[in-house]
Amino acid sequence: MGKKEMIMVKGIPKIMLLISITFLLLSLINCNVLVNSRGTRRSWPYTVLSYRGKEILKKQKEDILKRLMSTSSDGYRFLMYPSQQKFHAIVISMDKFPQDYILAGPIRNDSITHMWFDFYSTQLRKPAKYVYSEYNHTAHKITLRPPPCGTVPSMNCLSEMLNVSKRNDTGEKGCGNFTTFNPMFFNVPRWNTKLYIGSNKVNVDSQTIYFLGLTALLLRYAQRNCTRSFYLVNAMSRNLFRVPKYINGTKLKNTMRKLKRKQALVKEQPQKKNKKSQSTTTPYLSYTTSTAFNVTTNVTYSATAAVTRVATSTTGYRPDSNFMKSIMATQLRDLATWVYTTLRYRNEPFCKPDRNRTAVSEFMKNTHVLIRNETPYTIYGTLDMSSLYYNETMSVENETASDNNETTPTSPSTRFQRTFIDPLWDYLDSLLFLDKIRNFSLQLPAYGNLTPPEHRRAANLSTLNSLWWWSQ
């Protein structure tokens, strides 16, 4: 046997060893897959369905349609003409929990789950139409309550979600003392745009878009700790945004911290000093409260008048050190619900192109109700906004406990005043800012070259009184 043949013979056991190890690894992988396939695994929600999965979903919808058609003649009319017929309820049997839905409340396996269910099948070549439904887990039946609101996004579905939130009977519960970030930022670029909510165009400002978008992320993330809360407001957000189901908490917190730092006071540039004159200096500029000028509907501007402007480096937005502090998650939910109601007043017929632009708008009238009443009445009904207010302690001169019922016996020089939480305060102050811009734009064609008004955040209620509709 030659030397070359000896090398080949010695290499044969090594090749066989590698082949046997490969087969062993493949067998272990196959066994692991087999074990996992037997267990109950939760399917990944973002995977594309295979052909078999699509066929199974199609058969499920066909079965639902057959049961709906076989109930009565109302079922046929409800299916073919959903917007023209009104019924109290249609009950059909359903063995499994549906897939195409938007939750209106938590999933309760021992009772009823409220949702908006898409009852149209894909083979009908029609857009998705959501109808408010109640699924009974114990009886394995679903109750459809027509008429459907339509597609999502749409103004009809947003209005129906606001109507359901007014009743508050979907099983939602409070979230205790869980806090979150305040997304009502004041120091943001100001611009207006038109959003398409379905086929409806809505005029929205930039601060409202920032607030609603960040609120959708924060409340979706808050459901990790509050599993029975925020379903209705998250359903409303689907009419404006595409919020992912799973949110990276670390990225969200870092983003909110960066945005929060941009709202703080402007830092002063440190100056070089000699060793002899070293002293303690304040890292921030001193905040001086300045009353904003009064703006009315008949204000006049003079083109030759000297306008004093505050330097950008000295502009402060909040005199205290607790600016942009955390708020309760339930307060954020209530404020977001209120802002969603204002979208209806920015749409037709309340916002026609040929409207009287100098008259009081329906949007301002609706906001004025919130200022004067903690349970304001809207076109969707009465909403409870009491969580957006708190008792603020204010000093009282020459007043005793017997003179005023609001004065506490232990501190006769102080009393409580009902005021707004920070997000609502910033929201109202932004209306003051927009009102200045509105009056400036009305006077600009008549007077030509004018300097835009400077605005500082309102530091007290007397500054907010500059709103021309405040005292009405």
UniProtKB/Swiss-Prot annotation:
Keywords: Glycoprotein, Membrane, Signal, Viral envelope protein, Virion. Its main location: virion. GO terms for cellular component: plasma membrane; viral envelope; virion membrane. It comes from the Viruses. InterPro entries: Herpes_UL74. Belongs to the herpesviridae U47 family. This is Envelope glycoprotein O. It comes from Human cytomegalovirus (strain Merlin).
